[in-house]
Curated annotation (Swiss-Prot):
Assembly and interaction partners: Homodimer.
Catalyzed reactions per annotation: prephenate + S-adenosyl-L-methionine = carboxy-S-adenosyl-L-methionine + 3-phenylpyruvate + H2O
Positions contributing to S-adenosyl-L-methionine binding: Y39, G64, C65, S66, D89, N90, D117, I118, N132, R199
Keywords for this protein: S-adenosyl-L-methionine, Transferase
Name of the protein in question: Carboxy-S-adenosyl-L-methionine synthase
First-level EC class: transferase
């Protein structure tokens, strides 16, 4: 059962940097619904994309799977034989709960739930890869290498779904969408103290890029087609396709 997120409702003397620990994992479903506009839509649409792109005898990778929401959405929409989903996260608390969530919903498609670093995972025979609010937690200098690896491991015609919090090259637009996101969190019951303390913990850990920067990296990796398919305020998702005639 999900618990309500009250982690930052009282003043914290020494905030430190953000970690996906046991306390965060316990309230994560409530936290992400109240913090990320459009999250449920993105999760459900990832399933629809899986129905279109997952091919028989291939693998799907959920890189930074947290509690397995995207994995479950993909699995519900796979209608082929001999497919497998590989879900990876480096948080022991998240992985423990993810395994429980996956085991609670029976389906023919097997899921390997792995506690590990997504930078160390081999991507092979993939028809779809999901990076759902994950890349932003990697050091910027390490992001290109991961996208290069994903491109190499995707089969021709395969898809990468890349969801992120965005920064904006237009400062005026960035300020507006930043403020609207905070309005969204206030409307969902977060206090000014909660918003401020969480932001302070995340600012050195979650480093955002512009859509233009993401597209430039994807193009450099070899992807020929990438476009923003969902956006709400400063959160959104790109769908990126490997050409069907790619070597």
């Amino acid at each position: 059962m999900s618990h309500r997120d009250t982690l930052f409702s009282a003043p914290i003397a020494r905030l430190g940097d953000w970690t996906f620990d046991e306390r965060v994992a316990e309230v994560f479903p409530d936290m992400i619904q109240r913090s990320v506009p459009g999250y449920s839509n993105i999760i459900s649409m990832i399933g629809m994309l899986a129905e279109r792109f997952v091919q028989p005898g291939t693998q799907v990778y959920d890189l930074g799977c947290s509690l397995g929401a995207a994995t479950l959405s993909v699995r519900r929409n796979i209608h082929h034989d001999n497919c497998k989903i590989i879900a990876i996260d480096n948080s022991p608390a998240m992985i423990e709960r993810c395994r429980r969530h996956i085991d609670a919903y029976k389906a023919p498609t097997p899921v390997d739930v792995i506690e590990g670093d997504i930078r160390d995972i081999a991507i092979e025979n993939a028809s779809m890869v999901v990076l759902n609010f994950t890349l932003q937690f990697l050091e910027p200098s390490e992001r290109q290498a991961l996208l290069d690896k994903i491109y190499q491991g995707l089969n021709p015609g395969g898809a990468l779904v890349l969801s992120e919090k965005f920064s904006f090259e237009d400062a005026k637009v960035g300020e507006l969408l930043f403020n609207m996101h905070h309005d969204f969190k206030r409307a969902n019951g977060y206090s000014e103290l909660e918003i401020s303390q969480k932001r302070s913990m995340l600012e050195n850990v979650m480093l955002t890029d512009s859509v233009e920067t993401h597209k430039a990296r994807l193009h450099k990796a070899g992807f020929e087609h990438s476009e923003l398919w969902f956006q709400c305020f400063n959160f959104g998702s790109l769908v990126t396709l490997k050409a069907e005639d790619a070597a």
